[in-house]
Amino acid sequence: MDYSYLNSYDSCVAAMEASAYGDFGACSQPGGFQYSPLRPAFPAAGPPCPALGSSNCALGALRDHQPAPYSAVPYKFFPEPSGLHEKRKQRRIRTTFTSAQLKELERVFAETHYPDIYTREELALKIDLTEARVQVWFQNRRAKFRKQERAASAKGAAGAAGAKKGEARCSSEDDDSKESTCSPTPDSTASLPPPPAPGLASPRLSPSPLPVALGSGPGPGPGPQPLKGALWAGVAGGGGGGPGAGAAELLKAWQPAESGPGPFSGVLSSFHRKPGPALKTNLF
């Protein structure tokens, strides 16, 4: 059997299916195309496809409406290896300055930190450099100068803060020294001389009640009794210590001047009597 008519029918159906969706190449943006599920009607004026023979179907017209591949891709979308090589070549070479060039640059920088274009060009011709190199050097030199100024100001502020702390410490030490001089310390009280012995100090203070005791009454009876008691107590106390110098000093202090004629001559003359045996034994 001959099945050639089946092949011709399949080719015609494929052609009708492709023409039903319209032309996609005419749209500038593929996302803006809206799909319509309704198929448009076939043109009535066009000749229908014959049932047999696939040579009469206009399949060549469909190829004219198809877009060319990669039509939306821009020019040189994919980078070439030569572009990366050019970027690597654009790296700046570090400039090395000689001592003579640095000397001239520093001299101009001492005069002005911002030289104009004419000064830079003249300096570049003088030291055999380009004007761009001279300009970059001045930019770096100004940055270095500002950094040095900031470091110097920070160091000065730290020194001033240290000086203020030292002054505050000295003032506190001065206040402490003033307080220590005003209030006695335990060591200063220890260096004071010891108080005199009670036996030696009492005879020096005991002659003060003499006029009171003597002026209380004209009679020589009970007046000098307290004096004698104090005298014997002082002699006895002094005998317990050093009997040599202490007793001699005590007797010398109690020896009165020569008494003249008066109401108390009898009383005072009693002190000139020689000490008895009891006193001698206590003193020596």
From Swiss-Prot:
It is found in: Nucleus. Residues 235-245 have a biased composition (Gly residues). InterPro entries: HD, Homeobox_CS, Homeodomain-like_sf, Paired_Homeobox_TFs. Pfam families: Homeodomain. GO terms for biological process: dopaminergic neuron differentiation; locus ceruleus development; midbrain development; noradrenergic neuron differentiation; oculomotor nerve formation; positive regulation of transcription by RNA polymerase II; regulation of respiratory gaseous exchange; regulation of transcription by RNA polymerase II. Keywords: Activator, Disease variant, DNA-binding, Homeobox, Nucleus, Transcription, Transcription regulation. Residues 153-163, 199-215 have a biased composition (Low complexity). GO terms for cellular component: chromatin; nucleus. Belongs to the paired homeobox family. May be involved in regulating the specificity of expression of the catecholamine biosynthetic genes. Acts as a transcription activator/factor. Could maintain the noradrenergic phenotype. This is Paired mesoderm homeobox protein 2A.
